[in-house]
Amino acid sequence: MSSNKIVLSSSDGESFEVEEAVARKLKIVEHMIEDDCVVTEVPLQNVTGKILSIVVEYCKKHVVDEESDEFKTWDEEFMKKFDQPTVFQLLLAANYLNIKGLLDLSAQTVADRIKDKTPEEIREIFNIENDFTPEEEAAVRKENAWAFE
């Protein structure tokens, strides 16, 4: 494993110096390294410093690809620290940076948080306006009564 350092720079100018092995967890960076496009610094224009610091923490923990109960427990506790807007930003960053494990974890966290919520509660979480008339909503509920049981 290489001990080279790479600086990851966020959209708001924060820099994070990490081991190459950690940087390679970001597949977008790994492809740059493999294509000899990375010298020492990688600008990540779609990720803020706040979110990049969380991504770096996750990648440092997961630098060794290992599936175990310890990782699962750590992942669950890790995600509990973040509010919904932060989880959404992590989801977007994980997608942009191509970090499958973090993408899956973020998506599962969102799914777990909306599980057993009413449509109104889900609309509030996602800031979605209800554009159904009361009549249309009643028709949809009647048509899909099994889903509301």
Swiss-Prot record:
The keyword Endoplasmic reticulum does not apply. The gene is ASK14. Belongs to the SKP1 family. This is SKP1-like protein 14. It comes from Arabidopsis thaliana. Involved in ubiquitination and subsequent proteasomal degradation of target proteins. Together with CUL1, RBX1 and a F-box protein, it forms a SCF E3 ubiquitin ligase complex. The functional specificity of this complex depends on the type of F-box protein. In the SCF complex, it serves as an adapter that links the F-box protein to CUL1. Its main location: nucleus. Residues 91-149 are annotated as: Interaction with the F-box domain of F-box proteins. The keyword Nucleus applies. Restricted to inflorescences, pollen and leaves. It is found in: Nucleus. Part of a SCF (SKP1-cullin-F-box) protein ligase complex. Interacts with CPR1/CPR30, At3g61590, At4g39550 and At5g49610. InterPro entries: SKP1 (IPR016897), SKP1-like (IPR001232), SKP1-like_dim_sf (IPR036296), SKP1/BTB/POZ_sf (IPR011333), Skp1_comp_dimer (IPR016072), Skp1_comp_POZ (IPR016073). Pfam families: Skp1, Skp1_POZ. Keywords: Nucleus, Ubl conjugation pathway. GO terms for cellular component: nucleus; SCF ubiquitin ligase complex. Pathway: Protein modification; protein ubiquitination.
